[in-house]
Regions:
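C-terminal active-site/capping subdomain that shapes the small-molecule cofactor and substrate pocket
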Residues: 50-116
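Helical "substrate-binding/catalytic lid" subdomain
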Residues: 1-77
C-alpha cells in the first residue's frame, strides 16, 4: 500500500508535468505545486469528501475533452486518466458526492478505448 501511494503519486505528478510542458508551459511546477499540495492535504484530512473536479461533479463533457486531449499526447496517460477517473467516480458515488445516474455518463466516457 505504501509503494502504491508513494511511487504512483510520483508517476502521476511527473506525467501531469509532462502534459503541461507539451501544452507549452515552461515551468509547470510553479503552477501545480500549490494545487497538488492543497489536494494532498485535503485528501489526508477529509478523504473522499475532498474530491473535486469534473468527475466528482459528473461533468462528462469536460472529461471527454480531457480524454481526447491527453490521448493526442500519450495513449498510456489517457489509459491512466480513464482508469483513475473510473476509480474516482466510484469513490465519489460511495461518498455521496456523485449520483449513480450521473456516474453512468462518466463511465461511458471513461470506458477503456472510449472518449476519443
Amino acid at each position: 500500500a505504501l509503494a502504491y501511494g508513494s511511487n504512483y503519486l510520483i508517476t502521476l505528478v511527473t506525467q501531469c508535468l509532462d502534459l503541461l510542458r507539451h501544452a507549452g508551459l515552461e515551468d509547470p511546477q510553479r503552477l501545480v505545486a500549490p494545487l497538488l499540495g492543497a489536494s494532498l492535504d485535503n485528501a489526508l484530512r477529509w478523504g473522499d469528501q475532498a474530491l473535486t473536479g469534473p468527475v466528482a461533479r459528473g461533468d462528462a463533457a469536460s472529461v471527454a475533452v480531457h480524454v481526447r486531449a491527453i490521448e493526442e499526447v500519450s495513449s498510456e496517460a489517457a489509459s491512466a486518466y480513464r482508469a483513475l477517473g473510473r476509480l474516482t467516480a466510484d469513490r465519489a458515488v460511495g461518498a455521496g458526492l456523485l449520483k449513480a445516474r450521473d456516474a453512468e455518463a462518466l463511465l461511458e466516457v471513461l470506458g477503456e478505448g472510449r472518449g476519443r
